[in-house]
Amino acid sequence: MKYSRDPNGIYIASISGGKDSTAMTLLLLENNEPLDYIITAEIADFPEALHVIDKLEKISPVSVIRVKVDFEYYFKDYEIKNGKYKGYKGYGWATLTSRWCTSLKRDNIHKTVKELANGKKVYEYIGIAYDEINRRNIDSNKLYPLVDNKMRQQDNLKFCYSRGFDFEGAYNHLTRISCYLCPFSLLRNLYFVYSQYSDLWQYMLWLDQFSRFPFRPNETLSEIDRRFRKIAKQRKLF
């Protein structure tokens, strides 16, 4: 893989602090690929992901732009302007038909990138793994280093480990380390928050009172909390 620089373009790496985008960024830096900015939008991220961004900031020769997104404001206070819930306060928990937090993250990144580009053509590196190639968006402005190098998710994790990025062991327990309060997370990921980050779990329970939607269509967060309490109690017996 070697990308040619467009003298009239700007090159951005969008990262989350997870294994794939981190492997991509390290690969770009090691191969001295065209790269002007590394950018991330921080919105209810696992601490391990934030620590990865901290570490990248220290070693990267290019600027790392951290866009802060006020998740709590949009969750409970933002006045909805359109649609069925126009006039309501806060989006509440994301649903299958309203993954607003994903859109908010993407829109904040795009807004920042547009400001950085200042009229130049934007080339964006996307950390999609080779075994997730179906997620790729065919666009001349989108670049997929992991796909081009046929690096699968497990390859990416090993690559990060070999470069000293171990995610503090998070991938021994989690499948993903992006948003810790995502309703679409696997139960094992949620249990990790419950058992390892009681402060974040309590924050989720506090947020729950402001949502007009249950955490999941068939289960409230309080019900999940009660289930986790039973599991924790049973584990203490052995």
Predicted regions and their residues:
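Nucleotide-activated chemistry modules centered on ATP-dependent adenylation/adenylyltransferase
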Residues: M1-F238
